UniProtKB/Swiss-Prot annotation:
Organism: Salmonella choleraesuis (strain SC-B67)
Protein family membership: Belongs to the MnmG family.
Residues binding FAD: G13, G14, G15, H16, A17, G18, V125, S180, Q370
Record protein name field: tRNA uridine 5-carboxymethylaminomethyl modification enzyme MnmG
Swiss-Prot/TrEMBL cofactor(s): FAD
Annotated binding of NAD(+), by residue: 273-287
Broad class of the protein's primary localization: cytoplasm
Cellular location(s): Cytoplasm
Single biological process term from Gene Ontology: tRNA methylation
Purpose of the protein: NAD-binding protein involved in the addition of a carboxymethylaminomethyl (cmnm) group at the wobble position (U34) of certain tRNAs, forming tRNA-cmnm(5)s(2)U34.
InterPro entries xrefs: FAD/NAD-bd_sf (IPR036188), GIDA_C_N (IPR049312), MnmG (IPR004416), MnmG-rel (IPR002218), MnmG-rel_CS (IPR020595), MnmG_C (IPR026904), MnmG_C_subdom (IPR047001), MnmG_C_subdom_sf (IPR044920)
């Protein structure tokens, strides 16, 4: 039977991608249905209890700048906040927070249940309704059919998921949850390229069986960082430390002596695992010269005794996991409460997607999260928001939107996936972005909130706060530009006390702030340049914009040159065999990838600058050279 009401957008899956997709579509005013196999696991942290990190924190800030949920949720659930790379430049600084799993899940569910235009329904999805290469709905486990103009797949590791512990394996979407086998079979019937990937998780330890007295503590930062541009530190719950232990030669011997019982090394697992989050087996074998690896013991929550040992993800048998855990300092008597495991699952080639994350072959079908070959909550959330907003736009007969590489880490993520694809779980790093000085955590709102408002993602409260911040930045910069001090002025001695070389000529507040030894806080503590802005976010922007002005201007010039290629569009139906002068290899790659622009084509491996020149000349001759606005 069909459900009585049609929807504009259906989201399948309630993880980090699905929840952001559902919130985005509903915020834009479209009638949205979120289908999940279990309402109680909405926003579940399946692996590590943390949000953010290098590259990942940037994505969280961008999701927040577009009105998303993740940053707000972690501000309410974070039990330890830190700025990583704090001593480095602003481009690579990143926020990371340990999370209380229960509080995080509660924050997500509360937001979902209070979002207008959003209905949540508990049923596993087993089929899609596809008519004439267009998705028009979904069918649940009990045969209930829902109609919609767009469907977003955010199914994580559930598609034909297989859990491995030692040489034993069984079907599962994650520990304690069933896999989605009928939906996996249905998707394999569609004209989509599918492969297998693998990820893993460590055993969880009972905190009461760990001797923390012999371990080093790691505390959060003070003052506490905040993730959301709308948040404040008073929202954070009680803060707790993490602890550090290490593997040792005994640990490594246990692992080496049991590799024949590892499903990875025994050839039982076919899927490729994450390069940047390897299992402890992989670390010991790949870095054989190292006699220890640092392991962070991270609390899973304020009301839980479970500890997440970050760094020993494993699929070795349970008895070997016990030996590994008990070989480390402080864990000699530790007890495991949940075994570690590896999981294999289906993923679909993201090169078959448009930059909007809509399928090139099934109209109205969007993919987001691990189904696209990524790993990590943050990567999933960012894709979910993009897929959700574009599903909403499609359902309203509007054109899709995707950020450029020069505009957001989300743009880098989507361009990498759709242009290059991936053969292993893709993780975001700042090193993947060529314009990272422009794509900082601190300016995510300046880059994206205006666009979020145009798209209908940003509410009135956030928009008012954003404009107030812009005004504060502009007013303060003008004040510093127009406030001067001369070497002979009474205030010069106070200024010189903060400088490595004294004033030799008249200088404005901005001139002084450009000096590497002068901070905004120091400058505004001087009588001549007081008072400081009360808006800390605006003050941070003033300092960064002034200090890095020259570098930022140079990078902006590079972006404008590159935009010419990015804006030169390629017809989706172009058969590159028509273009004389291209090599067979280039023709094959261009026909396979079907890039949307010259810029995208130039990033395909094997497509040379000469090939790009030939293509541009051919397009001009054919009268097909056109650029987007």
């Amino acid at each position: 039977m069909f459900y009585q009401d049609p929807f504009d957008v259906i989201i399948i899956g309630g993880g980090h991608a699905g929840t952001e997709a559902a919130m985005a579509a509903a915020r834009m005013g479209q009638q949205t249905l979120l289908l999940t196999h279990n309402i109680d696991t909405l926003g579940q942290m399946s692996c590590n209890p943390a949000i953010g990190g290098i590259g990942k924190g940037h994505l969280v800030k961008e999701v927040d700048a577009l009105g998303g949920l993740m940053a707000k949720a972690i501000d309410q659930a974070g039990i330890q906040f830190r700025i990583l790379n704090a001593s480095k430049g602003p481009a690579v600084r990143a926020t990371r927070a340990q999370a209380d799993r229960v509080l995080y899940r509660q924050a997500v569910r509360t937001a979902l249940e209070n979002q207008p235009n959003l209905m949540i329904f508990q049923q596993a999805v087993e089929d899609l309704i596809v008519e004439n290469d267009r998705v028009v709905g979904a069918v649940t486990q009990m045969g209930l059919k829902f109609r919609a103009k767009a469907v977003v797949l955010t199914v994580g590791t559930f598609l034909d998921g297989k859990i491995h512990i030692g040489l034993d394996n069984y079907s599962g979407g994650r520990a304690g949850d069933p896999p989605s086998i009928p939906l996996s079979r249905r998707l394999r019937e569609l004209p989509l390229r599918v492969s297998r990937l693998k990820t893993g998780t460590p055993p969880r330890i009972d905190a009461r069986t760990i001797d923390f007295s012999v371990l080093a503590q790691q505390h959060g930062d003070n003052p506490m960082p905040v993730f959301s541009f709308m948040g404040n530190a008073s929202q954070h719950p009680q803060q707790v430390p993490c602890y550090i232990t290490h593997t040792n030669e005994k640990t490594h011997d246990v692992i080496r002596n049991n590799l024949d019982r590892s499903p990875m090394y025994a050839g039982v697992i076919e899927g490729i695992g994450p390069r940047y989050c390897p299992s402890i087996e992989d670390k010991v074998m790949r870095f054989a010269d190292r006699n220890q690896h640092q392991i962070f013991l991270e609390p899973e929550g304020l009301t839980s005794n479970e500890i997440y040992p970050n760094g020993i993800s494993t699929s070795l048998p349970f008895d070997v996991q016990m030996q590994i855990v008990r070989s480390m300092q402080g864990m000699e008597n530790a007890k495991i409460v949940r075994p570690g495991y590896a999981i294999e699952y289906d993923f679909f080639d993201p090169r078959d997607l448009k930059p909007t994350l809509e399928s090139k072959f099934i109209h109205g079908l969007f993919f987001a999260g691990q189904i696209n070959g990524t790993t990590g909550y943050e990567e999933a959330a960012a894709q979910g928001l993009l897929a959700g907003l574009n599903a909403a736009r499609l359902s309203a007969d509007k054109e899709g939107w995707a950020p450029a590489r020069s505009q957001a880490y989300l743009g880098v993520l989507v361009d990498d996936l759709c242009t290059l694809g991936t053969k292993e779980p893709y993780r975001m790093f700042t090193s993947r972005a060529e314009y990272r000085l422009m794509l900082r955590e601190d300016n995510a709102d300046l880059r994206l909130t205006e666009m979020g408002r145009e798209l209908g993602l940003v509410d009135d409260e956030r928009w008012a706060r954003f404009n107030e911040k812009l005004e504060n930045i502009e007013r303060e910069r003008q004040r510093l530009k127009s406030t001067w001090v001369t070497p002979s002025a009474e205030s010069a001695d106070e200024v010189n006390a903060h400088l490595t070389t004294p004033l030799s000529r008249e200088a404005s507040g901005e001139d002084l702030l450009r000096r590497p030894e002068m901070t905004y806080a120091q400058l505004t503590s001087l009588a001549a340049f007081a008072p400081a802005l009360e808006d800390e976010q605006a003050a941070e922007q003033v300092e960064i914009q002034v200090k890095y002005e020259g570098y930022i201007a140079r990078q902006q010039d590079e972006i404008e040159k590159q935009l010419r290629n990015e804006n030169t569009l390629l017809p989706a139906t172009l058969d590159y065999r028509q273009v004389s002068g291209l090599s067979n290899e280039v023709i094959a790659k261009l026909n396979d990838h079907k890039p949307a622009s010259i810029g995208q084509a130039s990033r395909i491996s094997g497509v040379t600058p000469v090939a790009i020149s030939i293509l541009l000349v051919w397009l001009k001759k054919q009268g097909m050279l056109r650029r987007s606005a």
